[in-house]
Every structure is written in structure tokens, then in C-alpha cells.
Design a protein with these regions (language model features):
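The structured alpha-helical core of multi-pass membrane proteins
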Residues: 1-794
């Protein structure tokens, strides 16, 4: 091939190379797409693919068990087929997957889209500069020409409606957490119960014990991460799908080929004519055929919509339809085996291989839902709706694969309680169906708003979408609610508990922010103090953490009032969430100045998305110093580049942290001896320096941090004022950095209502005392931390 290219004249070669390169790129993209589709089987479809184990058993568990005839079985299969076609295929694959938020999916992604394209967010600290983020608006959306509908104006005007919208989203998140409890219980218990088909002497209690052992092992291994065994997830699910599809095809041909006629919706009409109200009640079991569908949208961020569509249409849909059809064909001739129809329908020669692979598939399904629960809790925390918890990243290569110890053990206890308490997949299925269908129903409502506000389509189209899918899901949900006394109460109890936790934390955090906003220090008072601020300025740099994006927090005045000395350089650091999934590193830092140049006071706003990691990295100090230096240089040159957020304090500039050109600073690796031999005087006493050395010896994660020496370049001419400020910045950095944070005690005012006192003084106080501290959550070095105690009367 190379010889052929070499013989082509140059002008022809130029014409042929772009086309060849286009073919190479197409092949590369095609292979990557197929790889993503392959990997999605182990992450997205585990739950959906294990549903055939218990769908028919749950459907015939109630009064429908009195209708043991072929017509009823045909009607149930027809309902399963059309439900599986309309909800997963038509609604999710064809429509909902297109409503991604920069590649992310789930209820929080829809809510985030709505908050950005309509002013529905309740997050504090929102700024005009946030709207200039490259990930803020969808491609092609222009705010200036956006349609401003009366509905949009109505929602933006009424805060209570925006609060209700947030509560609906949180309720959906709580139901997802409920899935994290119920999915492992029903998947593992139903797969292990297959033993009773061959081991007749095995009693229910022994099956439950075996299931509990498997569940304990599953949750106990979560801290190890799944990267070592994740490569097995996709093959397990694919082999499982091929097995059950082959068995379904065999059963269809062997038992009753006429079952194919039930693909006609006419059998649904005949089913309800035959069963009446009892048929409607059975919908609570039939809906289990689509549980796990939401994972296609929720896990969109790990793949892309095309790969998920390929996997569903290419393998998931045909395999599951064949299995449901074959199982119905078997039941039409063996209705007495309905209590364990899946395992009874397996030919004896392949029973044990199928049993083993079903158990593995159940574990994969459980693992996927547990990981999704960790992800949803992290998103709630990022939006200020969940207490601080320990978040461990279990993979270096896959972003977003996390483990939360507290949530893991809570899920394990709840899952074991459900398994031991109910001991029946039918009862657990009643709870599971309610949780899953509620999330789908909430997605439908949010999707209708996205169609109007984000896609800017007609309200009529949104209403058609809402009425069509809402009526289907509403029918299933209404049927499930009948079964609340038979286990259906579990997701509501779990959701109520987590909703209280989320709302109390959000309410307390918001009240605390309002207190800071109302009691921030006046800039006039700061300016009257002069460059020294009326206190002793000691060598070093102070990072003052605050929730405010503007103004000086009250913690500063509280500190200097009790200890009238502060560092020569002050940086007010605000780490805030923006309703986007990720923020590019080059757009995270907003740098500004507080007061005149001689005050040496700066503001740094670090913006995070709801999927980003909020913590102080090892190189955070150096990044911040370089960003401030670049701001000083840009300000000195009067640069108009970048993005500015005008405010009474001055302008905020977006600093690209990956581009340090123009900072007049150079960085190089430095060993410990170089750092200690610096001529800059330190603000730390000899005793404190010895304590720091001892702390670093006992803390490997601190002592092994990458040390970088920052120096001022002398190769270029620098403005005298800029050079002086840069030198002061470097001197402060080399003298030592201290992290100042508020240690708050939030109390309700005496005039507050009784409910507010309960919420703040009891519930919020309990959560604050038992969650991780902000310094620990942000990975701030303990030896450099100064905490300032303050009482907030809200």
C-alpha cells in the first residue's frame, strides 16, 4: 500500500490523503463507539437484564393468580412487550437520551439544564461570569434570542415553585437511593432462590441466609473498588443475555409458538376485559420488566448516547423480548410453575450454568446500582443538599468512580433488613416497582420542562410528551400504590428519612449563608483602615475560606478583633458550585482584588460542577499563586483579555491555570533543603517549624507532596509596581501559608418559630456534628489550619 502511495504524483497524493485520513478517523471512531457499547452492558444494563427472573412471578402473585389460563398469560406478555417498547425504547432511547447535560444524564442533569436555561436555581453565589462558562449553555442556545415564555416567567417569579421543583428532584434522588437498597435485595434473593428448583430440601430460611452472605460480601468489597473485576462485568451480562435469549427462543418453539400472536396490542384489550380490576392491580408486577431503565440515562456520562442506543437496540431489546416470549410460552402450558417460572423454564441440561451466570448477573446489577447511589449522593452534596461525607476515588483512570463509606454501610444494613424482614421477592418487588416508576415519572415531568425551556420547542409538543408517557407511567404507579401495605411503604419511608436529611441540611446551609451575607464587613470600613488594616501585618500568606463571592466575611473582623495581627497577603477563597456537571480547569479560577493595590488583598473564586471533586490538591497553593501573579500582570498591563465580572470591589478575571505565560514567574522542582534554606524570613516560630517537620514525618501524604520553588524571572522588563507586588507575593508564599476557616455554631433566634428551632437547633446541629468537617473534606493540611469559632443566630 505504501509503495502504491509513493508512486502517486504529488498533486494526486494531496487530494487522496485527506480522504484516507477521513477513513482512518471513521474507523477509529467506529471502534471506540463499539467499545463503549460493549462496556455499557456491565454498567448500564445489569439491572434491566435480570428482570426476567422475577417479573412473571410478581405479576401473578396477587389476584391474577386466580386466572390460570392461556389468555391471561398472553395478555401479560403483550403488556410486557408494549411497556418494554414504549418506555425504554421510545421514551428513553429515542427521546430522553438526547437531553444530556454536556454528556451527563439523570434527574440532576435535567434539573441543572433547567436552572441554567431558566432562572430556577436556589444555589447562592451565582454570578454573571458563570454564564460565560463554555459548558453553561447547550450548543446552539443563544440567551439573547431565547423564547421567554409566560410559564418561564411564572416559575422564575415565584420562589415557592422553584423550591417545589427542587424538592421533586430531591425526592427522585431519594428514590434512587431506595433503589440502592432494594435492587441488591431482590436481584440476589431471586437468583439464589433458583436453588430450590433443583435442591427441593432447601427451605426459604436457608435461601435468605445464603443471600445475606452474598450481600455482606458485596458491600464489604466496595472499598476495594471495581476496577480489578470491572472488565468481567460486560462479558457476564452479554453471556447472560445470550443464554436467556436462546432459552426463550427454545421455549417458544417447544412449548407454544402461538405466543407470537400476543405481540398484537389486541391481547391487552382482551386481557383487561377478562381480568378487570384484578388485571389493573397486576400492573405493579408487570412494571418490574422496565426497572433499571433509568440507568440508561443516569449513566450516560460514562459513555455516550449513541453507544447506549447501539447496545440496547442491538442486543438488550431482542434478547429480553425473546426471553419474555419464551417464558410466557412455557407458562401457557405450565401455569402451576408460576411461582418460579424462570428457573422452571430452563432445560435441565443447562440449568446449573444458567444458575451460576444468573447469580453473577445479579451481583453485577447490584454493583451498578450501588455505584449509582454513591454518585447521586455526591451530586446532592455538590448542590448543598447533603451533609459532607468521605468520598474515595477508587480508580485513577475512570473519573466519577467513587466509594462513600458511610453510605455503603447504611445501604448494607438497610438491604439486609429488607431481605431478612420480607424474605419474599414479591413483597420486595412491590417496593422496588414504586421506587423505579416514581423516578421515571419525575423524569417525564422534568423532560417536559426541558422540551420547553432548553430545546425551545412548542408547549403542545411538551404536553403531548407529558400526557402520553405520563398516563402510561401514572397507570403503573397507581397500581403500585395499591400495594403500599404489602411492602410498598418501604421506599416512602426511606425517601422521607433522606428527604428530611437533605432539606434540613439545605435549609441550615442557606440560613447560614444569608447570615454571612447580611453581616459581611463594609468595604468603607476596610478602606478607612489604610493598607495596614489597623493591625500588625506579619510575614506569610493567609487563605481565608468563605462562602461569599463578594464582600469581606464577618469571620475576618471577628479574627482581627480578638487577635489584631494578620498575614501580609490575604486571599479570600470561595469554593462554590455551579449547576454544570464539569468545569474545564482553565475556567475554574476567578481572581480579583479587594481594595487598593497596597492592601495586598485578593479574592479567588474556585468554581466546581456537580460532578467535580471539591478538595485542595497538592499543587493548589502553587496554582493559586501563579493565578494571582497572572492577574497582577494582566492588571498592570491593562489587559482586556479574559472574562470580567464587574463589582464594587473591582473586576474578576478568569485565569487559565494551564497557561502560566506572562506571569513573570518560573517554577522548578525543589528538594526539602532548598525550601528550608530560603532567605525569606518565616512567620513560624522555631517550635512551630519543628512541629511541622514532625507532622510531615508522621503524615506520608504530606511529606511526599511535590515541592515546587517559584521564582521571579529577571529576563524581561517589569513595571516597578508589578514587580514589587510579585515580590511581596513570593515572600509571603515562602514565609508560609495558613488556612483560616470558620468553626460555626448555628443557633435559631429566640423569636424563631418552634419548627425552625427544631430544624436548626436539633436536626441541623446533629448533622453538622456528625458529618465530616470542611477542612477534612477539602484535604487541608491540619498543621496549617486555623479555625475561628463563631456563633450564627439565624
Amino acid at each position: 500500500m505504501d509503495q502504491e502511495i509513493g508512486s502517486i504524483p504529488h498533486d494526486r497524493l494531496v487530494r487522496h490523503l485527506p480522504f484516507r485520513q477521513q477513513i482512518v478517523n471513521w474507523k477509529s471512531d467506529y471502534k471506540r463507539l463499539l467499545l463503549l457499547a460493549y462496556q455499557s452492558f456491565g454498567v448500564v444494563y445489569g439491572d434491566l437484564s435480570t428482570s426476567p427472573i422475577y417479573v412473571y412471578t410478581s405479576s401473578f402473585a396477587g389476584r391474577l393468580n386466580n386466572y390460570r389460563d392461556e389468555q391471561t398469560v398472553f395478555g401479560v406478555f403483550s403488556l410486557i412487550f408494549w411497556t418494554f417498547t414504549l418506555i425504554p425504547l421510545l421514551k428513553y432511547v429515542m427521546i430522553v437520551l438526547g437531553a444530556d447535560d454536556n454528556g451527563e444524564g439523570g434527574t440532576f442533569a435535567l434539573y441543572s439544564l433547567l436552572c441554567r436555561h431558566a432562572k430556577l436555581s436556589l444555589l447562592p453565589n451565582q454570578q454573571a461570569a458563570d454564564e460565560e462558562l463554555s459548558t453553561y449553555y447547550r450548543a446552539g442556545y443563544i440567551p439573547q434570542i431565547a423564547i421567554y415564555s409566560p410559564l418561564k416567567r411564572f416559575l422564575e417569579k415565584h420562589k415557592r415553585l422553584r423550591t417545589c421543583l427542587l424538592l421533586i428532584v430531591l425526592f427522585g434522588a431519594c428514590m434512587v437511593i431506595g433503589d440502592g437498597v432494594l435492587t441488591p435485595a431482590i436481584s440476589v434473593l431471586s437468583s439464589i432462590s433458583g436453588l430450590q428448583v433443583r435442591a427441593k430440601k432447601l427451605v426459604d430460611g436457608e435461601v435468605v441466609i445464603i443471600s445475606c452472605v452474598v450481600l455482606v460480601g458485596l458491600f464489604a468489597l466496595q472499598h476495594k473498588g471495581t476496577q480489578r473485576v470491572a472488565f468481567m462485568f460486560a462479558p457476564v451480562v452479554i453471556i447472560w443475555l445470550l443464554f436467556i435469549a436462546a432459552i426463550g427462543l427454545y421455549n417458544t418453539i417447544y412449548w407454544n409458538p402461538r405466543i407470537i400472536h400476543a405481540l398484537s396490542p389486541h391481547y391487552i384489550v382482551k386481557f383487561f376485559e377478562h381480568t378487570g380490576k384484578d388485571g389493573w392491580i397486576s400492573l405493579g408486577g408487570i412494571l418490574l420488566s422496565v426497572t433499571g431503565t433509568e440507568a440508561m440515562f443516569a449513566d450516560l456520562g460514562h459513555f455516550n448516547e449513541t453507544s447506549i442506543r447501539i447496545a440496547f437496540v442491538g442486543l438488550i431489546y431482542p434478547c429480553l423480548v425473546l426471553q419474555y416470549m419464551g417464558q410466557a410460552a412455557f407458562l401457557s402450558k405450565n401455569i402451576h410453575d408460576v411461582s418460579s417460572s424462570f428457573f422452571e423454564s430452563i432445560p435441565q441440561s443447562v440449568f446449573w450454568p444458567v444458575f451460576v451466570i444468573s447469580s453473577l448477573a445479579a451481583i453485577v446489577a447490584s454493583q451498578s446500582v450501588i455505584s449509582a447511589t454513591f454518585s447521586i449522593v455526591k451530586q446532592c452534596h455538590s448542590l448543598g443538599c447533603f451533609p459532607r461525607v468521605k468520598i474515595v476515588h477508587t480508580s485513577r483512570w475512570i473519573h466519577g468512580r467513587i466509594y462513600i463509606p458511610e453510605i455503603n454501610w447504611i445501604l448494607m444494613v438497610l438491604c439486609l433488613s429488607v431481605t431478612l424482614g420480607f424474605r419474599d421477592t414479591t413483597i420486595i418487588g412491590n417496593a422496588y416497582g414504586i421506587a423505579s416508576m416514581t423516578v421515571m415519572f419525575i423524569t417525564t415531568w422534568l423532560m417536559a420542562l426541558v422540551i420547553i425551556f432548553v430545546w425551545q420547542n412548542s408547549v403542545i409538543f411538551a404536553l403531548l410528551f407529558l400526557i402520553f408517557f405520563g398516563s402510561i407511567e401514572g397507570a403503573y404507579l397507581s397500581s403500585s400504590l395499591i400495594k403500599v401495605p404489602q411492602g410498598g411503604w418501604v421506599p416512602f419511608v426511606l425517601s422521607f428519612i433522606f428527604m428530611v436529611i437533605m432539606y434540613v441540611w439545605h435549609y441550615g446551609t442557606h440560613e447560614k449563608y444569608l447570615f454571612n451575607l447580611q453581616n459581611k464587613v463594609s468595604m468603607k470600613w476596610i478602606l478607612t483602615l489604610g493598607p495596614s488594616l489597623g493591625i500588625v501585618r506579619v510575614p506569610g500568606m493567609g487563605f481565608i475560606y468563605t462562602e461569599l463571592a463578594t464582600g469581606v466575611p464577618s469571620i475576618f473582623s471577628h479574627f482581627v478583633t480578638n487577635l489584631p495581627a494578620f498575614h501580609q497577603v490575604l486571599v479570600f477563597v470561595c469554593m462554590k458550585s455551579v449547576p454544570v456537571p464539569y468545569i474545564p480547569p482553565d475556567e475554574q479560577y476567578l481572581i480579583g482584588r479587594i481594595g487598593p493595590r497596597t492592601y495586598r488583598m485578593y479574592r479567588c473564586i474556585i468554581r466546581y460542577g456537580y460532578k467535580d471533586v471539591q478538595k485542595v490538591e497538592d499543587n493548589f497553593e502553587n496554582q493559586l499563586i501563579l493565578s494571582i501573579a497572572k492577574f497582577i500582570q494582566m492588571e498592570g498591563e491593562g489587559s482586556s483579555t479574559g472574562s470580567y465580572d464587574s463589582s464594587p470591589e473591582g473586576r474578576m478575571v478568569v485565569i487559565r491555570t494551564t497557561d502560566t505565560s506572562g506571569t513573570r514567574l518560573v517554577t522548578r522542582d525543589a528538594d526539602e533543603s532548598e525550601c528550608n534554606s530560603t532567605p525569606i524570613r518565616s512567620s513560624k516560630s522555631v517550635t512551630l517549624q519543628s512541629l511541622q517537620s514532625l507532622y510531615e514525618e508522621e503524615s506520608p501524604h504530606v511529606s511526599h507532596r511535590h515541592r515546587v520553588q517559584i521564582e521571579l524571572s529577571e529576563t524581561e522588563d517589569i513595571n516597578c509596581e508589578v514587580k514589587e507586588e510579585l515580590m511581596a507575593l513570593l515572600e509571603a508564599k515562602q514565609a508560609g501559608v495558613a488556612y483560616i476557616m470558620g468553626h460555626s455554631y448555628v443557633k435559631a433566634r429566640k423569636t424563631s418559630s418552634f419548627m425552625k428551632k427544631i430544624a436548626i437547633d436539633v436536626a441541623y446541629s446533629f448533622l453538622r456534628k456528625n458529618c465530616r468537617g470542611p477542612a477534612v473534606a477539602l484535604n487541608i493540611p491540619h498543621i496549617s489550619l486555623i479555625e475561628v469559632g463563631m456563633i450564627y443566630h439565624v
